Structures are given as structure tokens and as C-alpha cells.
UniProtKB/Swiss-Prot annotation:
GO terms for cellular component: cytosol. Catalyzes the condensation of carbamoyl phosphate and aspartate to form carbamoyl aspartate and inorganic phosphate, the committed step in the de novo pyrimidine nucleotide biosynthesis pathway. It comes from the Bacteria. L-aspartate binds at K94, R177, R231. The keyword Ion transport does not apply. This is Aspartate carbamoyltransferase catalytic subunit. It comes from Rhodopseudomonas palustris (strain TIE-1). Heterododecamer (2C3:3R2) of six catalytic PyrB chains organized as two trimers (C3), and six regulatory PyrI chains organized as three dimers (R2). Keywords: Pyrimidine biosynthesis, Transferase.
Amino acid sequence: MTPAPKSTFVLGHRHLLGIEGLSAADISGLLDLSEEYVELNRQVDKKRTSLRGRTQVNLFFEASTRTQSSFEIAGKRLGADVMNMSVSSSSMRKGETLMDTAVTLNAMHPDILVVRHHASGAVELLARKVDGSVINAGDGAHEHPTQALLDALTIRRNKGRLEGLVVAICGDVMHSRVARSNILLLNTMGARVRVVAPSTLLPAGIERMGVEVARDMREGLDGADIVMMLRLQRERMNGSFVPSSAEYFNYFGLDQKKLSYAKPDALVMHPGPMNRGVEIDSIVADGAQSVIREQVEMGVAVRMAVLEALARNLPNA
């Protein structure tokens, strides 16, 4: 068993429902703690006992591979008893409401609930009904805080900082909770954020979030330190937002030519899952500038840090 982390950071919130409301100090504290877990996860003995005796329930109402497995691994490496619950195996398929599910689970006294839901705001509503800590693993098009944190950790480890960097977020910004959480975090940490998308995939009033807006890749990637691609979220679209996948790739898909508009040492990022040949070319996704696989690695470390920081607030912690 490895020794306890050196960082004594405690998140001053009972839940992690979003990046909104976190201070720069909160974000830095979580990233610093995450750094310790990056190193731990590369060792043979990856176990700590921070969550020993605690119960973690992963409650996913949307399909997930990376996020759910990442949270499961994170909890188990910290010593928690982890239960995975999907909607297909829950009473909600039989008509039970989200609030009834929350009350039922709360009666079992879980310490931490990790929740993903297709409706924006659903995780916050659930958090009001439970006694333990709740982590938002993605709610509709609203927020995905741990994705933004792992993206920030990936950037900081490669660039040494967040402040002053030009980050281009490209693609389906309108339907992306990842985009929203990243914009909030990057603005808080002093980065310069630019969103790049056709008008049909930009939310009305996006400028009010403190971002620059570009409607073509040459303008959007000019001078960018980070190129963050987003997939087309067709499952959230109720109409035709792009003429075709081929035409979308022609104008907004990241290939080697478009990547050349950014700085020569720009990082290529993607939260996954990738639609190769739609928003990103395989040569770029698997190329020397890509840190997409590193993002997955950082995800486990960040989620361990979030679980640890919240657990320190729990009774008898």
C-alpha cells in the first residue's frame, strides 16, 4: 500500500456539480492533487486507502465507456466499494422517477454518487435529495466538470501553464457539455478561448461566456496553442445542423493542412468518442501532436483527486 498523498487540499464544496462556482485556487488544488495520482498510477502498487469503508455508486442514465470505467478504476484504487448502476438495470425503466431513485439510493447510505444524466440540471436536482457527495459525470449539454479538469491537467503537463494560452475549441459547441465546462475553467485560469464552428452549431450569445468566435478553421486556429476537437452530437440534434458528414469534414474536420494554421507545437485534443473522418482525420488523431491517449490517462488521476478531495469533507473523514 502506498503512502497518503502529500497534498492536503480539501474541496470547499460538498458536491462537484460543475466548473461554475469553482475558484482558480480550487482548480489548481485539484490539478496539484491529480499530479500525485498520475505518478501513483504508473507504479506497480496503485492502491491507497483514502476511501476504505466508503461506498461509491456510479449511476449512469446515458451510455459511457471512458467516464464510467475511469470513475470505477479511480474509486477502487482509493479503496472504495464501487457499485455500477445503469438505467437498463434500474427501476426507472419501470416508471420510477429520478427523485424516487435518489431517495431509494439515499436510504442505502452511499457516501459518493457519480451521476450522468441526459437532462441538463438533473444531477443538481438529485444532489438535493441525498446526504452523500454527488459528482456530475455529465448532464445533458450543461456541464462535464471532470472532463474539463483532465483536459486542463493534460495541457498544464505539456505546456507548463494554462494562463495566456490560446485554446481553440472546434466543432459542435452548441450541444457540448465539454465545451461549456472547458470554457468556464479556461477563462477562470486566464487562458484565451476561441470557439470555431459553423453558425448552426454555435449557441446564441456564446460571446457572453467570454470567448472569441470564428466561423472558419483558418481564422480559428491561427496562433492556437491547443486545438480541441468536438464530435457532432447527433443524439442531441432534433434537425439537420450540417449538410453532410463529408461536407462538414471538408470545412471543419481537422486534417494536417488545417492543423498547420495553428502553432507548430500546438496540441491536438479530443474528449472522445472520436468520429474519424468527420471531425478529425486519423493521421492527426494518431500523430505526434496528439495528446488524446494522454487525456484518457489523466482522467483516472483527476477522478481519484476529485473523489479524495470530496471524501475529506465526509463525516469521520
